[in-house]
C-alpha cells in the first residue's frame, strides 16, 4: 500500500525555524521575507506504509504529467506485487492519460480517499516531517534550491524510516507511587 499526494506550491522564501528556545529562554525567531512570485515548485510524494520509505519529485506545476511521472516512479520502485495507491480526489488523478496508464499497468490500483477525509492519507502526516527536515529555518533563492533540499531531506528521512500505522500509539502504563489495599 502506498499513499500519494502533492505538496505546494512551495515558493522560494525564508521559512520559519523549527520551534525552539535559545539559551537565555527566548523563542528562536528569524526575519521572514514573503513574496509571491512566479518561481515555485510543487512536491509530489509517495509513502510506502510497510517500511516508511518515501519517494519524492518536484515539478513546476500540479498537473497530470507530474502525477503520471510519480506513478511511473512508484511502479519502478516497487517492481513486484499489486500496488494500492491511496490518493485524494484531484481531477488530475482521474484524467484520461492517467486512466490509459492504469490500463497499461493492471497491478496498480488507485484507491480514492473519501471527500473530507484527507487524514486517512498518511502522506499528509509525512509532509509535516518533510517540511521540518527540508524547509524549517532555510532561505531559498529559486526552485532548484527547493528541489535540492527536498531530495536531501527525503534521503535523510528514508535513512531512519520506520513502518507507519494508523492511529495513536498505546499510552505507557502509569506507575503509581502508592498502592492502596482495602480490607473488609
PLM feature segments, named:
Residues 81-93, 116:
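Acidic/histidine-rich, metal-coordinating catalytic segments
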Amino acid at each position: 500500500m502506498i499513499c500519494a499526494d502533492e505538496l505546494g506550491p512551495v515558493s522560494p522564501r525564508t521559512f520559519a525555524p523549527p520551534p525552539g528556545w535559545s539559551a537565555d529562554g527566548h523563542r528562536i525567531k528569524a526575519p521572514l521575507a514573503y513574496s509571491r512570485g512566479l518561481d515555485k515548485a510543487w512536491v509530489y510524494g509517495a509513502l510506502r506504509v510497510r517500511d516508511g520509505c518515501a519517494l519524492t519529485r518536484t515539478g513546476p506545476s500540479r498537473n497530470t504529467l507530474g502525477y503520471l511521472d510519480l506513478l511511473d516512479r512508484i511502479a519502478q520502485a516497487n517492481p513486484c506485487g499489486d500496488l494500492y495507491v491511496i490518493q485524494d480526489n484531484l481531477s488530475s488523478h482521474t484524467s484520461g492519460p492517467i486512466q490509459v496508464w492504469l490500463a497499461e499497468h493492471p497491478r496498480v490500483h488507485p484507491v480514492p480517499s473519501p471527500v473530507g477525509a484527507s487524514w486517512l492519507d498518511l502522506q499528509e502526516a509525512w509532509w509535516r516531517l518533510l517540511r521540518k527536515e527540508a524547509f524549517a529555518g532555510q532561505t531559498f533563492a529559486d526552485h532548484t534550491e527547493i528541489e535540492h533540499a527536498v531530495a536531501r531531506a527525503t534521503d535523510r528521512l528514508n535513512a531512519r524510516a520506520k513502518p507507519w500505522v494508523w492511529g495513536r500509539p498505546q499510552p505507557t502504563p502509569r506507575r503509581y507511587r502508592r498502592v492502596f489495599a482495602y480490607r473488609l
